[in-house]
Amino acid sequence: MFEHLNSQPSDKIMELMAQYAEDTRTNKLDLGVGVYKNAEGATPIMKAVKKSEEILHRSQDSKSYVGLIGSIEFSKNIGGLVLNNSVDDKRLSFAQAPGGTGALHQLLLLARATKSVGNVWVSNPSWPNHQAILKHLGMNMNSYYYFDETTCEVNFDQMYKDLNDMRENDILLLHGCCHNPTGANLSLEQWVEITQLIQDKNVLPFIDL
């Protein structure tokens, strides 16, 4: 079986990580994977995480299978944290996934299965995996302008103009915070305008946090 498989191109980020590790210069900067590193270049476990793990270790009484949607208690708590308890629980549904990419993949699979969605709108630029997932699933993709390299800020006027071309039942993929790869975020006022546009156009927002 394996002799019929073709070699895939190496991951660009992993290549950069390897090059960084081999670089002997003392003044090098790692701008690759988005994880915190201390002055020694290590990624320590945060004290709050350590403490939480210790509490869980002492209190957890089972590792039995919890079902396809995962831990209901965890889901409710994380939902309250993200939404600041501003939405009625009856309007919320949860399903846990292996990371943000896995969650987006599952959502897009669900959307594709309905056979009712149109194009998926992705920012330009965006995280390359977003386009890769859509290509893998065979879904139609449109891009919308996002980042102005001259001002290093969101070009909201052009973004809004592009998104005006959305049609009913399209999907709009947004970055909830720390836009990848630009780091440029929408202001609260701009979020309000985009939310109104989503309602007016009757499109489905997917927000990658």
What residue spans do the PLM features occupy?
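N-terminal "arm"/small-domain region of PLP-dependent enzymes with the aminotransferase-like
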Residues: 1-68, 80, 84
